């Protein structure tokens, strides 16, 4: 399986790895088929700008690379702008992914949406965007 230089760079040197304590939004998604689990943390200011974004991913190299790239693509943008992130944009930013790894980019998109949904829930804003519920991991009680 051939990976682009960007995929390898984001796998070997992932950006924004870690957790944000008291994050305004936290999203967890997973895919049983591949075994990948992504957790995304968002720090959001009073103007709805994502000032920091971190992730923890348990999974393959493509899952780590797509998580890393997704954080880079949304940091500094508004929450509304982050919701426009697509898996295709993540793939393009990484200069492509093998077809069998495209699902990792879908998880990265869904992790961002899941974190935004958590933020919206915390501030009482309605969730007015589509969530792929089959990959969203239920909240721990």
Place the predicted regions along the sequence by residue:
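Glycine/charged-rich beta-loop-alpha catalytic/anionic-binding loops adjacent to active sites
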Residues: 44-55, 89-93
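Helix-adjacent hinge/juxtasegments
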Residues: 42, 51-53, 70, 81
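Short, thiol/selenol-centered motifs that function as redox-active sites or metal-ligating centers
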Residues: 34, 57-65, 104
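C-terminal binding/interaction regions
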Residues: 1-27, 77-81, 85-141
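Structured beta-strand/loop patches that form or line metal/cofactor-binding pockets in enzymes
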Residues: 17-50
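Alpha-helical support elements that line or immediately flank enzyme active sites
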Residues: 62-77
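Active-site cofactor/substrate anionic-group-binding motifs, chiefly glycine-
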Residues: 49, 58, 73
